[in-house]
């Protein structure tokens, strides 16, 4: 039996005989003495193999990297000057008495401590990749986060209840993963995008406080912070106001950060969606970046520069400035690089002005666009931006969405750049906030219809119900997102608990009564049986752990993730299935060669 983890051997065990089991991380032969770094999930310890134990030493000579070993030995102090302050075991070593190879290893395709591996190599050989100390730390932290969440919720009266994985396809924004039913010909289950409706039904059923740490599935285009299957901390509660819900779960996240990584998060400012978009062009602003938009739409309506005046005069247009203190030192090449960057977000280009001497007005400015702006516009730019000598001003002018996306991304990129950090435009800190008062609906110009911004079960703010009949664009939702360092950690809303209001929302979304009954009849029926006021939210566990570890991707905090093409390189999923399986499911492929042989 193992008596201790390798990574936990310390001075406390000095003079004791220990039994350790793990993997040979590294083997070194120094003048007839063999050193083996034994690794397990808790860390490393140095094993010393002396030749005076002939049989053990002979076994040690044959040990290679990644052999699985059992070690019995004496814990002793390392010789002076050989201590390793980076290890828990850094002041001690284990003098080996017995060495058993539990299982040898073929030569690994890479060194476990190699930090320059491609992601393809790492995901193809994920089992070996997971042996790397950083990956083990990431997944151990993930476990501790889950444990702290459960402890907090259990202490606050929440009940862990499972909801179905095979459910009904409902419109929630992304494409569903569909599962054909063998016994119900032509019918399909959907894997849940979230337990949204079931957790609301649990509130109607009277469970009062529910939570679940569960898998959710969305068949959508993938980015660095997305996976087709992801883990959600799902929560719902009855009889609490929006403010009480936010307060409780701000407390939960504070507790989790404090108890897992020793971080005391600062206070959470509350910002409306409208303010966030106005100042930062984003509903999840990174408040570590000290740059804000300056609104210039009204100023540019009468300038003789159509690049600015056309969007300024358009109902859906916007013109903003982004002042970059000290930015006049940027080279033309750097500015051209930012110009190409904003094109990724749909911008046609990037106008700019370098301010050399603000007191001279246009004469103190350097830019190809200055000649197109009248004196009043120049004066207003100077006054509103508060620009100083040596500053640079970027401009965004286009449809409001393009401006928000492009200049919002530019703001973050400049702030995070070496220039931004050198010039104090970025503060390395934890910057949480709540974003509230989201629009309830957004207009789809192509389809000429309104869509729900969050989901169609979000309650409108008091007094906004009538807007659903007259002007859905004015309707504000009781919705809230928790944002940390520019990432949405979680979000939720107060739900609709009255059937007539829910029907009104369906009507605004052009979901007819019959269609609503087919898709959501079970919910509408349940709401008629004294449904309590309720609300909740969901946190992305993958994102929380990614933030804590500062990993580049959520794939670094998931044991067996998918690629950006939704593939598992380890197992080869998704894969072809044989024709017999398809026949049992009453499925025939258009490309008959795509199925395997029966």
Swiss-Prot record:
Source species: Leptothrix cholodnii (strain ATCC 51168 / LMG 8142 / SP-6) (Leptothrix discophora (strain SP-6))
GN (gene name): aspS
Coiled-coil stretches noted in the UniProt entry, renumbered to this chain: none
Listed GO MF terms: aspartate-tRNA ligase activity; aspartate-tRNA(Asn) ligase activity; ATP binding; nucleic acid binding
Record region (Aspartate): 196-199
Annotated L-aspartate binding sites: 172, 218, 454, 495
HAMAP family on file: Asp_tRNA_synth_type1
Binding site for ATP: 218-220, 227, 488, 540-543
Keywords in alphabetical order: Aminoacyl-tRNA synthetase, ATP-binding, Cytoplasm, Ligase, Nucleotide-binding, Protein biosynthesis
GO cellular component, one term: cytoplasm
Protein name (Swiss-Prot/TrEMBL): Aspartate--tRNA(Asp/Asn) ligase
Predominant location: cytoplasm
Described function: Aspartyl-tRNA synthetase with relaxed tRNA specificity since it is able to aspartylate not only its cognate tRNA(Asp) but also tRNA(Asn). Reaction proceeds in two steps: L-aspartate is first activated by ATP to form Asp-AMP and then transferred to the acceptor end of tRNA(Asp/Asn).
Localization: Cytoplasm
Family the UniProt entry places it in: Belongs to the class-II aminoacyl-tRNA synthetase family. Type 1 subfamily.
PANTHER family attached to this UniProt entry: ASPARTATE--TRNA LIGASE, MITOCHONDRIAL, ASPARTYL/LYSYL-TRNA SYNTHETASE
Subunit-structure text: Homodimer.
InterPro entries in the record: Aa-tRNA-synt_II (IPR004364), aa-tRNA-synth_II (IPR006195), aa-tRNA-synth_II/BPL/LPL (IPR045864), Asp-tRNA-ligase_1 (IPR004524), Asp-tRNA-ligase_1_N (IPR047089), Asp/Asn-tRNA-synth_IIb (IPR002312), AspRS_core (IPR047090), GAD-like_sf (IPR004115)
Gene Ontology biological process terms, A to Z: aspartyl-tRNA aminoacylation
